[in-house]
């Protein structure tokens, strides 16, 4: 009789340990970048988000409105601002090359810069940002993000979890599912080591590119930027028009 009781106690103890381990709070804080007017996208994100993981909402500025875009004119390279104005006034105008952007992209850029400032002000060590058309389809995403922190510790600046395109650094290949990159496109979801990024923040200015492709500049200055494919956990909802006005 004693043996079965002991077995039950052991099983209960193991179960408690497993549950305790799986419920361990992540070492990072999450942020959601959205617009006040993007209620549907925001609510869809929140419907799929685990509320036990700390989340702060960043409401960006809608710079598709010229009066809002003008606030940032002084931190944008003049030629890029002029081209953005041309795109605003002429629907048939094309961009000189892929680094040029429309007015709406300015607000997106500054929303990501607001993310950095909040992380610095709150003395966070690690932080993750989601854009509001991300849909979390598998709760493993939180563990996958924590795994990057567990593996890299202080030895990285950023890790992207979604991309449209990238240029791998084949000389720094890893077997852990992490891929170091020299260039990457898309800022839908990424992790930063806050302290390590402090020295790179100034290099985001002046604005002369889209925020995602601007990371090429900090990579050239030594930032260790990685990519981890989390498409099995994340889905990008493209059923609605771009909130920055891109086609």
Question: Residue ranges of each PLM-predicted region?
Answer:
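An acidic/histidine-cluster motif and surrounding catalytic segment
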Residues: 5-130, 134-247
């Amino acid at each position: 009789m004693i043996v079965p009781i002991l077995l039950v106690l052991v099983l209960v103890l193991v179960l408690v340990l497993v549950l305790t381990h799986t419920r361990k709070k992540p070492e990072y804080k999450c942020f959601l970048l959205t617009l006040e007017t993007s209620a549907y996208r925001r609510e869809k994100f929140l419907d799929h988000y685990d509320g036990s993981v700390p989340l702060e909402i960043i409401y960006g500025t809608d710079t598709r409105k010229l009066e809002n875009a003008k606030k940032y004119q002084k931190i944008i390279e003049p030629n890029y601002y002029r081209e953005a104005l041309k795109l605003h006034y002429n629907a048939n105008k094309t961009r000189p090359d892929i680094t040029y952007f429309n007015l709406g992209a300015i607000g997106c850029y500054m929303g990501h810069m607001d993310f950095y400032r909040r992380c610095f002000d709150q003395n966070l060590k690690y932080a993750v940002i989601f854009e509001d058309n991300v849909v979390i389809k598998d709760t493993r995403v939180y563990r996958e993000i924590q795994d990057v922190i567990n593996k890299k510790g202080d030895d990285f600046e950023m890790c992207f979890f979604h991309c449209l395109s990238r240029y791998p650094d084949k000389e720094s290949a890893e077997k852990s599912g992490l891929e170091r990159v020299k260039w990457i496109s898309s800022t839908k979801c990424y992790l930063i080591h806050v302290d390590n990024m402090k020295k790179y923040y100034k290099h985001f200015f002046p604005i002369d590119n889209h925020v995602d492709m601007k990371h090429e500049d900090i990579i050239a200055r030594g930032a260790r930027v990685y990519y981890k494919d989390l498409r099995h956990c994340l889905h990008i909802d493209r059923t609605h028009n771009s909130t920055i006005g891109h086609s």
